[in-house]
């Protein structure tokens, strides 16, 4: 869902709100959340989740062009942790859908390689309409 879609959904749910007013409300909320995170605060929305900051320590990187070592300074990056109610709601939704919807599900690199060797992702047990999504994380 994009910000524009969220604004439209808010305006549709509350007919007394003009689209412009819904847009202002969404922007105001997002600005307040951004400001809080920029100031180092944690945001908790019970039942939905929490936004916080993770620290990435300084490290030595490489300039890809020259190969020269470069010191990458410490960073603080925003992080979202889903709340229990949201996790359970998403899980229940996936259970209701069963195996019929695998779009966007993480697939291991091993499964993708095996599917290619076997003649495509259909041969590896993926539904014909689904294309495996490779998810890489640290």
Swiss-Prot record:
Pfam families: Bac_DNA_binding. Keywords: DNA recombination, DNA-binding, Transcription, Transcription regulation, Translation regulation. Disulfide bonds: none annotated. GO terms for molecular function: DNA binding; structural constituent of chromatin. InterPro entries: Hist_DNA-bd (IPR000119), IHF-like_DNA-bd_dom_sf (IPR010992), IHF_beta (IPR005685). The keyword DNA-binding applies. Residues 81-98 have a biased composition (Basic and acidic residues). It comes from the Bacteria. GO terms for biological process: DNA recombination; regulation of DNA-templated transcription; regulation of translation. One of its GO terms (cellular component) is chromosome. Residues 81-138 are annotated as: Disordered. Heterodimer of an alpha and a beta chain. Belongs to the bacterial histone-like protein family. This protein is one of the two subunits of integration host factor, a specific DNA-binding protein that functions in genetic recombination as well as in transcriptional and translational control. This is Integration host factor subunit beta. It comes from Ralstonia nicotianae (strain ATCC BAA-1114 / GMI1000) (Ralstonia solanacearum).
């Amino acid at each position: 869902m994009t910000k524009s879609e969220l604004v439209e959904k808010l305006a549709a749910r509350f007919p007394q709100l003009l689209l412009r007013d819904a847009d202002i409300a969404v922007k105001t909320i997002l600005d307040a959340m951004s400001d809080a995170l920029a100031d180092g605060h944690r945001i908790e929305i019970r039942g939905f989740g929490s936004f916080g900051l993770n620290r990435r320590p300084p490290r030595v990187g490489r300039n890809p062009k020259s190969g020269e070592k470069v010191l990458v300074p410490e960073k603080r990056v925003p992080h979202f942790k889903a709340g229990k109610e949201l996790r359970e709601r998403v899980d229940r939704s996936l259970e209701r859908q069963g195996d019929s919807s695998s779009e966007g599900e993480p697939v291991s690199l091993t499964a993708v390689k095996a599917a290619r060797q076997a003649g495509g992702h259909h041969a590896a047990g993926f539904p014909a309409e689904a294309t495996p999504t490779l998810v890489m994380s640290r």
